[in-house]
């Protein structure tokens, strides 16, 4: 089973940059998107064989997630937890027979960490949500989680210390999540791989120089690890400032 997660930085824009060709090439069972920046009625496109589920922000052209799936989920829910988390279209949960899939676009802490307090609240609440799901069946948690966990996960850790996405507080929340029975699939398989990034600034020719950050993840319940065949990053795929990340699971 192949699952893909990709922050497309505006799906309408990405559709004009080969998104449908990518879907045909990827041959994924599930495609999770973040930062769709649209409502489903804003773009017509043909993607045969996939059911589509959308969660759009109240604010037009902002945030948003989508899940395209070949297998009909047992259930699909949108957002989670308290009311404050229910306006930006950031989470879709699809239940499958063997696991829950949670597609997430984590709030950015913003310049000067101006949204860090909300981000901390979000992190505590999403961890609680994932742990509650995990009590029922294993979880696959994927998306743009807006944090580079360790220094190996970005090109320039020293100059980015305390910038949004690499603050001590954000990194500690990821550590706390992983200590709660979850595993970062890519780092589990490739603990020492350097230069493996999923996002590059549009400035300073960052992608050409591979001056990037690994902020897109597939995180799974630890008991799912025996089924993980591979976890990878596809930096050669363009169309966004992020590239897709991939998880391959053995069938149960």
Where are these regions (language model features)?
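N-terminal, active-site-proximal structural segment of metallo-dependent hydrolase catalytic domains
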Residues: 1-47, 51, 57-63, 78
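Active-site-proximal beta-strand elements of phosphoester/diester hydrolases
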Residues: 1-9, 98-110, 142
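Active-site beta-strand/loop signature of hydrolases that rely on acidic residues for catalysis
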Residues: 7, 23-41, 101, 130-151, ...
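Metal-dependent phosphoesterases centered on the DNase I-like endonuclease/exonuclease/phosphatase
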Residues: 30, 51, 122-211, 215
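Structured beta-strand-rich core segments of catalytic domains in phosphoester-bond hydrolases
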Residues: 37, 43-109
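Conserved beta strand-loop-helix elements of the APE1-like EEP
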Residues: 60-75, 204-226
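Surface-exposed cleft-lining segments at the edges of enzyme active sites
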Residues: 81-82, 107-123, 158-162
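Surface polyanion/phosphate-binding segment centered on an Asp-His-Pro turn
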Residues: 232-252
């Amino acid at each position: 089973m192949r699952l893909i997660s990709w922050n497309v930085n505006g799906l309408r824009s990405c559709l004009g940059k080969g998104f449908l060709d990518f879907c045909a090439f990827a041959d994924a069972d599930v495609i999770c998107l973040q930062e769709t920046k649209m409502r489903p009625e804003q773009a017509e496109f043909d993607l045969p064989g996939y059911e589509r589920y959308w969660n759009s922000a109240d604010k037009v052209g902002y945030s948003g997630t989508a899940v395209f799936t070949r297998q009909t989920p047992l259930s699909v829910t949108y957002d989670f937890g308290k009311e404050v988390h229910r306006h930006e279209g950031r989470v879709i949960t699809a239940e499958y027979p063997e696991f829950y899939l949670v597609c997430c676009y984590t709030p950015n802490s913003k310049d000067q960490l101006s949204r860090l307090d909300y981000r901390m609240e979000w992190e505590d609440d999403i961890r609680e949500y994932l742990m509650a799901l995990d009590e029922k069946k294993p979880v696959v948690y994927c998306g743009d989680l807006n944090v580079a966990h360790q220094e190996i996960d970005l090109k320039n850790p020293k100059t980015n210390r305390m910038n949004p996405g690499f603050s001590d507080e954000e990194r500690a929340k990821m550590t706390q999540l992983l200590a709660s029975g979850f595993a970062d699939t890519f780092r589990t398989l490739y603990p020492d791989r350097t230069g493996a990034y999923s996002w590059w600034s549009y400035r300073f020719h960052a992608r050409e120089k591979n001056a990037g950050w690994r902020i897109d993840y597939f995180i799974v319940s630890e008991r799912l690890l025996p089924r993980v065949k591979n976890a990878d990053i596809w930096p050669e795929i363009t169309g966004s400032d992020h590239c897709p990340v991939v998880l391959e699971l053995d069938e149960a």
